Amino acid sequence: MRKKYFADNQNFKTVELLEHLDDKKYVYLPLHFQPECSSCPLGGDYVHQDLMIDMLIKNLPEDWLVVVKKHVKAGGKDYALSRLRPNDKVILADNSIKSLDLVKQASAIATITGTAGFEGFLNHKPVFIFGSYFYMDAPNVFKVSDSRSLKHAINSVIDDFKPTTLQEVKAFLYACQLNTSRAWVDNRYRSHCGISDAENADTLSGLILEKFNKWNLLDAGR
């Protein structure tokens, strides 16, 4: 018996192999692990991830899908999906499919602040970002605040999209390098920075004081 491309799963269809999406136009939306600062506070209202999915359903053309992938650490029934009514435009990607492969094949990426959005930018894809994060001003990254801005972004992608050039990608990364500092605020990234705890503390405190001075917060409190 031929294996079905899509199997019913929690009121949504599931795709188990990437090639089953070969002829599909889709927006890839990997769900965030929650609770985490990547969606609260950085996502604002879109901490409720079902709002993102629902807006995409309502604004995408009829022949486009929303391919959703659960976070590998979420487990069980996902809260965002449990709040949605069943819809044929929403497809769940099996966890065996690599996220980066879904990014590379997607027509666009949607995320609150996720790594998939940055990967989409690096792979010259249009990105719909619903939160606030460092790459939100990158070329072909569309900041979404409401249904109107999402509709405008979708129309821009469909009507007049020009993939980001390698030169534009490099220019943005160089700008990030010029405007960031080597430090960490999460111990998971300590080993990647190559600086001591004392250097890290000095850098972070210096950056905080710089902001306070810029906004005259220190003088205001005297």
Residue ranges of predicted features:
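A nucleotide-sugar donor-handling region in carbohydrate enzymes
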Residues: 1-37
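A short, aliphatic-rich alpha-helical micro-motif
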Residues: 21, 85, 103-104
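Short, solvent-exposed loop/turn segments at secondary-structure junctions
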Residues: 32-36, 72-75, 116-117, 134-135
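Mid-to-C-terminal functional-domain signal that highlights helix-capping/loop sites
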Residues: 36-50
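Catalytic donor nucleotide-activated moiety binding site of glycosyltransferases and closely related
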Residues: 53-93
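A donor-sugar binding/catalytic signature common to diverse glycosyltransferases
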Residues: 94-142
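Leloir-type glycosyltransferase catalytic cores
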Residues: 140-222
